[in-house]
Amino acid sequence: MTPPLPGFRDVRVVVAGDLMLDRYWHGATQRISPEAPVPVVRVDGAEERPGGAANVALNVAALGGEAQVVGPTGSDEAADRLAELLEAAGVGQRFHRIAGADTITKLRVISRHQQLIRLDFERGFPGFDHAAMLALLEPALADAAVLVLSDYAKGALPDPAGLIEAARRAGRPVLVDPKGADYRRYRGASLLTPNLAEFEAVVGPCADGDEIAKRARQLAADLELEALLVTRGEAGMTLAPREGVAVHLPTRAREVFDVTGAGDTVIATLAAALGAGVDLADASALANVAAGVVVGKLGTATVTPAELEAALGGGPAPAAGSGVVDEPGLLAAVRQARAAGERIVMTNGCFDLLHAGHVDYLQRARRRGERLVVAVNDDASVARLKGAERPVTPLAQRMAVLAALDTVDWVVPFSEDTPARLIEAVLPDRLVKGGDYQPEQIAGHDVVVAAGGSVEVLPLLAGASTTDLIARIRSRG
């Protein structure tokens, strides 16, 4: 039986480890290069997300907890961008910036939802040692409920055992996502969360779940751990406490699109649940459900409480249309969506007398990301742009009809002649406009592009316009 969803609101989690910036280039692949037998990708979109230890913290924040990251970075543009992304998601940062070092960056090229290649940018962190990490960590532990060590063997955790000892002295449980074959580095931790390949690299091949549990319990005893949670892909997970009965949790995934970052979601959900007072068995069951949700998403992603509640069967799946919002409500919703790794698409218009052309356009706009914001001119703004006889339909009715479309997430009004100020506040990943404009002519173009987003013009459905519709109505008396 899966436990009910706890409240994560006041749970504070510190995540120490290898901080990364994940970058994605998206595009179509239709031919092979004449220069070499490789596909040519025409890039038409790019996005950035926190990765590694930063993605663990992002997952905690997406669940509603308070998260802070601790670790080394370069003193470079990637570190600045990572800080901006974390700040936007409400995640605190304690970076140790090192001049001349690279912030760990992974660039993935994606076409048709398939990863074609990954390029890694990293050179290590010269001079960063245990004392430096401990100095970063100790102040953060003061008001934390749980410490997570996210180890990708990139140099952020030169002595994890020393950090574990410091956390245990402070009375904080320590969860570790381990790396490498020497788990003695993690002696005294509360819990390790290796995947099956990592686990078997330490203990040897295991024939079945029972053997996994047996060897995990022995390893827990040898290393003075409370338990191990071994993630096993399509076979689910095995929780093996040092004392007590092992539990095998079958997978909850319905579809698997991408396992990138799934381990981050598991340990983040465990940390948030344990910090909320859930026992280890129930916290592991929740983490298993969260993993089943996140592998159904593309790229490094997160899980929201609504998604977790729906997966638990305790509530409806999050609705695509979240209704009419004011600007503060929109910005709060966008922050939550970004914390969940969702791309924000934004468009705007009068949308007077909604017709098939509008519906077709909004459907195509929504396919550019996971969330669609529609900014709507208020009545006075429409009158200034279209003339005193417009709008035909008042603002409240126009917004209500738009919000009823399953392609639209949020509808927000604006009173200016252009939504430039609102666009700057939202900073969508992709700004979309219908018509025959040049992208540079679209309000908000410069700020969106400067923030790393893109601007796209979509052609409108021929023969469908509000002006023509009004003319036809008038011609029929």
Swiss-Prot record:
GO terms for biological process: ADP-L-glycero-beta-D-manno-heptose biosynthetic process. Pfam families: CTP_transf_like, PfkB. It catalyses: D-glycero-beta-D-manno-heptose 7-phosphate + ATP = D-glycero-beta-D-manno-heptose 1,7-bisphosphate + ADP + H(+); D-glycero-beta-D-manno-heptose 1-phosphate + ATP + H(+) = ADP-D-glycero-beta-D-manno-heptose + diphosphate. Keywords: ATP-binding, Carbohydrate metabolism, Kinase, Multifunctional enzyme, Nucleotide-binding, Nucleotidyltransferase, Transferase. HAMAP family: HldE. Catalyzes the ADP transfer from ATP to D-glycero-beta-D-manno-heptose 1-phosphate, yielding ADP-D-glycero-beta-D-manno-heptose. This is Bifunctional protein HldE. The lineage of its organism: Bacteria, Pseudomonadati, Pseudomonadota, Gammaproteobacteria, Chromatiales. The gene is hldE.
